[in-house]
UniProtKB/Swiss-Prot annotation:
Chain positions with Phosphoserine modification: S46
Listed name of the protein: Protein S100-A6
GO cellular component annotations of the record: collagen-containing extracellular matrix; cytoplasm; cytoplasmic side of plasma membrane; cytosol; extracellular exosome; extracellular region; nuclear envelope; nucleus
UniProt source species: Homo sapiens
Localization per record: Nucleus envelope; Cytoplasm; Cell membrane
Induction annotation: Preferentially expressed when quiescent fibroblasts are stimulated to proliferate. It is inducible by growth factors and overexpressed in acute myeloid leukemias.
N6-acetyllysine PTM sites in chain numbering: K40, K47
Modification N6-succinyllysine, positions: K47
Encoding gene, per UniProt annotation: S100A6
Length: 90
């Protein structure tokens, strides 16, 4: 039986691959795929405007190829984890 952290990491990977490759490269997220992932998989997703998602995409896309690769996605998750941790502190 997998440990909870193993399961959580597996879920993060599975969610990336659930949305990646619907358009173009199966190992990256397009802007449309990233938007869909955020809106369907994160509570904050329904609150973000298109302009905010576009800015997020620009910030995440470090290599400026107009797609978010897995490393860029993990950077995003790390930033979210820091925000969630701060919220728990109160």
């Amino acid at each position: 039986m997998a440990c909870p952290l193993d399961q959580a990491i597996g879920l993060l990977v599975a969610i990336f691959h659930k949305y990646s490759g619907r358009e173009g490269d199966k190992h990256t997220l397009s802007k449309k795929e990233l938007k869909e992932l955020i809106q369907k998989e994160l509570t904050i997703g329904s609150k973000l405007q298109d302009a905010e998602i576009a800015r997020l995409m620009e910030d995440l896309d470090r290599n400026k190829d107009q797609e978010v690769n897995f490393q860029e996605y993990v950077t995003f998750l790390g930033a979210l984890a820091l925000i969630y941790n701060e919220a728990l502190k109160g």
